[in-house]
């Protein structure tokens, strides 16, 4: 019996949805300890899914793609998974976990990038693929416009996974997740968001790059939460991240005053705050904020995960 445990991830921002330099996308993201995907797997001629997964269809689709690739099945027991379309990257982690399970069981020796290509993941953001292997804070380098000629989300892009260009261990800060019970942007809604918001202004892209290279990454190395928070808050006001936040009207933007280091993950609706103190107070404030707006809100206090997938035989 094989056991795999993967991180979740925050997607902090896409970097360049202007594309005039000859590359598009790029991104920054962070691996988290919780929530997580955990599965057990063993050889089987047919596909058998056990447990009570939230994302049954995603597991079935991933297994079908691997069965088509290698001609074998597997018995997979889902020990833990988490909601899709909330901005925490469950789709990529499920796909990669199932793919790695098949690779390990049948000696396929597939790299994570190869599995991602089989699964059709990582066509816009390379963050999920990178944190699966490495954990930590990751920057990916996007795609050449020779390969990807339009602005599309990963779910609608057939480009290869973006290359990882930087990876740092993240400090031992608390990460507070607030997951309000409202519909995120995925499928056709997400495609439409890209089409109506892109290309973003080049000056926004340049400022995002400046913030990442000269404020955010040094702040991680120096464990300077104040500077990290300043970069993070400004990024919420720029480029495609601004467009993502604005899809929720004033709802998401309105909670950004509740912490000094706060943002929205991916297309939302998950909001995250990073703190070295008072995690409980921030958690309560976020929960109360969404309750006052009429939304139930699940919260999780976790930490960054500075390692990737765990595999036990």
From Swiss-Prot:
Coiled-coil region: none
Catalytic activity, as annotated: 5-phospho-alpha-D-ribose 1-diphosphate + 4-hydroxybenzoate + H(+) = 4-(beta-D-ribofuranosyl)phenol 5'-phosphate + CO2 + diphosphate; 4-aminobenzoate + 5-phospho-alpha-D-ribose 1-diphosphate + H(+) = 4-(beta-D-ribofuranosyl)aminobenzene 5'-phosphate + CO2 + diphosphate
Name of a matching Pfam family: GHMP_kinases_C
Keyword annotations: Glycosyltransferase, Transferase
Record SUPFAM superfamilies: Ribosomal protein S5 domain 2-like
InterPro entries tied to this protein: Beta-RFA-P_synthase, GHMP_kinase_C_dom, GHMP_kinase_N_dom, RFAP_synthase, Ribosomal_Su5_D2-typ_SF, Ribsml_uS5_D2-typ_fold_subgr
Pathway: Cofactor biosynthesis; 5,6,7,8-tetrahydromethanopterin biosynthesis
Temperature dependence: Optimum temperature is 70 degrees Celsius.
Its EC number(s): 2.4.2.54
EC class (word): transferase
Alphabetized GO MF terms: ATP binding; beta-ribofuranosylaminobenzene 5'-phosphate synthase activity
pH dependence: Optimum pH is 5.3.
Record text on subunit structure and interactions: Homodimer.
Family: Belongs to the beta-RFA-P synthase family.
Known function: Catalyzes the condensation of 4-hydroxybenzoate (HB) with 5-phospho-alpha-D-ribose 1-diphosphate (PRPP) to produce beta-ribofuranosylphenol 5'-phosphate (beta-RFH-P). Also catalyzes the condensation of 4-aminobenzoate (pABA) with PRPP to produce beta-ribofuranosylaminobenzene 5'-phosphate (beta-RFA-P).
Protein name according to UniProt: Beta-ribofuranosylphenol 5'-phosphate synthase
Native source species: Archaeoglobus fulgidus (strain ATCC 49558 / DSM 4304 / JCM 9628 / NBRC 100126 / VC-16)
């Amino acid at each position: 019996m094989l056991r795999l445990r993967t991180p979740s991830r925050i997607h902090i921002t896409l970097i360049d949805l202007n594309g005039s330099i000859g590359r598009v996308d790029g991104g920054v993201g962070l691996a988290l300890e919780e929530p997580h995907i955990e599965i057990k797997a063993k050889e089987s001629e047919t596909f058998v899914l056990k447990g009570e997964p939230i994302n049954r269809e995603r597991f079935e689709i991933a297994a079908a793609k691997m069965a088509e690739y290698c001609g074998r099945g597997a018995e997979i027991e889902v020990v833990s998974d988490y909601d899709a379309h909330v901005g925490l990257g469950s789709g990529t982690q499920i796909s990669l976990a199932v793919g790695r399970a098949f690779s390990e069981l049948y000696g396929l020796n597939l790299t994570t990038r190869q599995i991602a290509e089989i699964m059709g993941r990582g066509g816009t953001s390379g963050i999920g693929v990178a944190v699966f292997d490495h954990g930590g804070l990751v920057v990916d380098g996007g795609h050449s416009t020779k390969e990807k000629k339009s602005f599309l989300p990963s779910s609608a892009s057939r480009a290869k996974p973006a290359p990882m260009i930087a990876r740092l261990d993240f400090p031992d800060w608390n990460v507070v997740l607030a997951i309000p019970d409202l519909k995120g942007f995925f499928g056709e809604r997400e495609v439409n968001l890209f089409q109506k918001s892109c290309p973003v202004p080049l000056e926004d892209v340049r400022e995002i790059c400046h913030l990442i290279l000269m404020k955010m990454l040094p702040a991680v190395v120096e464990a300077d939460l104040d500077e990290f928070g300043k970069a993070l808050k400004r990024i919420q006001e720029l480029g495609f991240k601004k467009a993502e936040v604005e899809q929720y009207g004033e709802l998401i933007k309105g909670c950004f005053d509740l912490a000094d280091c706060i943002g929205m993950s991916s297309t939302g609706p998950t909001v995250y705050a990073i703190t070295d103190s008072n995690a409980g107070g921030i958690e309560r404030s976020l929960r109360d904020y969404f309750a006052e707006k009429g939304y139930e809100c699940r919260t999780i206090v976790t930490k960054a995960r500075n390692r990737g997938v765990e595999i036990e035989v």
